[in-house]
Amino acid sequence: MSQKPFRVIIVGGSVTGLTLAHSLHRIGVDYIILEKRAKVVVQEGASIGILPNGARVLDQLGLYNTIEQSAAPPESSHIHFPDGFHFISPYPKRMFESFGYPIAFLERRRLLEILYDTLPDKTKLKVNKTVSDIEQYPEGGKYNARVRTIDGDVYEGDLVVGADGVHSRTRREMWRLSGSSPTGDVPVSERNSTSVEYCCVFGISQGLSGLRVGQQVMRIYNGRTLLVVPSKDELVFWFLSQKLDRKYEYSNAPRFTLEDAAAQCLQVADAPIADGIQFQDIWKTRQAFNMVSLEENLFKTWSFGPIVCIGDSMHKMTINFGQGANCAIEDVAVLSNLINELLLENKGMKPTFRDIEVLLRRFNRMHLSRVSDIFNMSWLVARVHAQDGLLRKIIGRYVMPYLGGRFDSRPFRMIADAAALDFLPLPRSSFPGWKMYKSREGGVVRNVFFLLAATVIVAWVCRLWA
């Protein structure tokens, strides 16, 4: 009997899942995508920001030019505080000059459309396929795993990748299988570690002239942050994040209606955005909007047997730092590199169950610290923007405006340290930031400078308030 080809089952036609499909195609790996919805491309009122670390991988896959044409990158950020102070940060422009990729804001729907339209074989994507259960076969067989959907269909493969978001069914099945194995089981404390402290109203408006493309506006309040990003064709992307009354567990996180969202937005209706324009003018021209809880968590255990979860199913962040999708794209790069390496080492022989298990543990081990750094920065940025606590209020109001580019070095270093596909050329690698900000001993000196400067400013502010 001839050997079946190595096959990956991707659960979720998300940005993460579709990017993985493109990457697997580049290394000649067979795959199938199971999407629970009837359509991949849907309007949910959401936008997405592609930063240089995500952009570079998408560029390697030949997808970025279309994305770039669909976006109007911001050049500056105008940041306003409750006491009337404001400053202009050239952070977006510096990012572009450093890495060759701007912050590309576009509709999430448009990004999904690009990823779907460019799939080499759309028959590999199956819609209306909700996963019911997953089984594994460690004792050998044609394939390592079998995925069954609620309509009774069965799909077999050697590796199952959960790219199905924060409410991941793949993750639950992985936990179920792990719990029945003497070598597995994820601690209950880890399973229940997702929490919610913030919510967000996000939306898209169109048809309002008078906003300058490239000039994003952030208004910082106590416990609340409003971000407005004007784009091309008079599109405006906006976000209103709010600290909740308490910290919730994932299982009892609040759910919101459109009426709840409208009530939140009306509270900042008179917020000035540009000359003669208030947020209520943006609200009146809304096309779509929604309100959701912002889950936060970084799971430590990403795989069991031939099953692995990536993206929001393993690391869910708030929106403020903008790295959620970009971090997921990095997951794709690291996992694809390891799969390609294993296939080359096996020289045509199909990897065994044990091979896949070892590969996934290695993926978890080598990538977790990188994701942890991004997650921790995202956690901090959300709370600085919300002025959550005295120290974080001081950092946002008195440190960030005065340290300028020094404050940019840490997020820039995170971008420079990003994973990329090691089997495809690196475009735009000549831009200075990829080498200048890459972690090295000099980075310690920069951190010491930043901490000393921040300490001096904090001490000065505390003296004023004393």
Curated annotation (Swiss-Prot):
<dbReference type="InterPro" id="IPR050562">
    <property type="entry name" value="FAD_mOase_fung"/>
</dbReference>
<feature type="binding site">
    <location>
        <position position="49"/>
    </location>
    <ligand>
        <name>FAD</name>
    </ligand>
</feature>
<feature type="glycosylation site" description="N-linked (GlcNAc...) asparagine">
    <location>
        <position position="192"/>
    </location>
</feature>
<protein>
    <recommendedName>
        <fullName>FAD-dependent monooxygenase dpfgE</fullName>
        <ecNumber>1.-.-.-</ecNumber>
    </recommendedName>
</protein>
<comment type="pathway">
    <text>Secondary metabolite biosynthesis; terpenoid biosynthesis.</text>
</comment>
<comment type="similarity">
    <text>Belongs to the paxM FAD-dependent monooxygenase family.</text>
</comment>
<dbReference type="Pfam" id="PF01494">
    <property type="entry name" value="FAD_binding_3"/>
</dbReference>
<dbReference type="GO" id="GO:0016114">
    <property type="term" value="P:terpenoid biosynthetic process"/>
</dbReference>
<keyword id="KW-0325">Glycoprotein</keyword>
<keyword id="KW-0285">Flavoprotein</keyword>
<keyword id="KW-1133">Transmembrane helix</keyword>
<keyword id="KW-0732">Signal</keyword>
<keyword id="KW-0812">Transmembrane</keyword>
<feature type="glycosylation site" description="N-linked (GlcNAc...) asparagine">
    <location>
        <position position="376"/>
    </location>
</feature>
<keyword id="KW-0472">Membrane</keyword>
<feature type="binding site">
    <location>
        <position position="108"/>
    </location>
    <ligand>
        <name>FAD</name>
    </ligand>
</feature>
<feature type="glycosylation site" description="N-linked (GlcNAc...) asparagine">
    <location>
        <position position="128"/>
    </location>
</feature>
<dbReference type="GO" id="GO:0016020">
    <property type="term" value="C:membrane"/>
</dbReference>
<dbReference type="GO" id="GO:0071949">
    <property type="term" value="F:FAD binding"/>
</dbReference>
<feature type="signal peptide">
    <location>
        <begin position="1"/>
        <end position="23"/>
    </location>
</feature>
<keyword id="KW-0274">FAD</keyword>
<keyword id="KW-0503">Monooxygenase</keyword>
<feature type="binding site">
    <location>
        <position position="35"/>
    </location>
    <ligand>
        <name>FAD</name>
    </ligand>
</feature>
<feature type="binding site">
    <location>
        <position position="312"/>
    </location>
    <ligand>
        <name>FAD</name>
    </ligand>
</feature>
<feature type="transmembrane region" description="Helical">
    <location>
        <begin position="443"/>
        <end position="465"/>
    </location>
</feature>
<feature type="binding site">
    <location>
        <position position="325"/>
    </location>
    <ligand>
        <name>FAD</name>
    </ligand>
</feature>
<dbReference type="GO" id="GO:0004497">
    <property type="term" value="F:monooxygenase activity"/>
</dbReference>
<dbReference type="InterPro" id="IPR002938">
    <property type="entry name" value="FAD-bd"/>
</dbReference>
<keyword id="KW-0560">Oxidoreductase</keyword>
<comment type="function">
    <text>FAD-dependent monooxygenase; part of the gene cluster that mediates the biosynthesis of diterpenoid pyrones. The first step of the pathway is the synthesis of the alpha-pyrone moiety by the polyketide synthase dpfgA via condensation of one acetyl-CoA starter unit with 3 malonyl-CoA units and 2 methylations. The alpha-pyrone is then combined with geranylgeranyl pyrophosphate (GGPP) formed by the GGPP synthase dpfgD through the action of the prenyltransferase dpfgC to yield a linear alpha-pyrone diterpenoid.</text>
</comment>
<dbReference type="InterPro" id="IPR036188">
    <property type="entry name" value="FAD/NAD-bd_sf"/>
</dbReference>
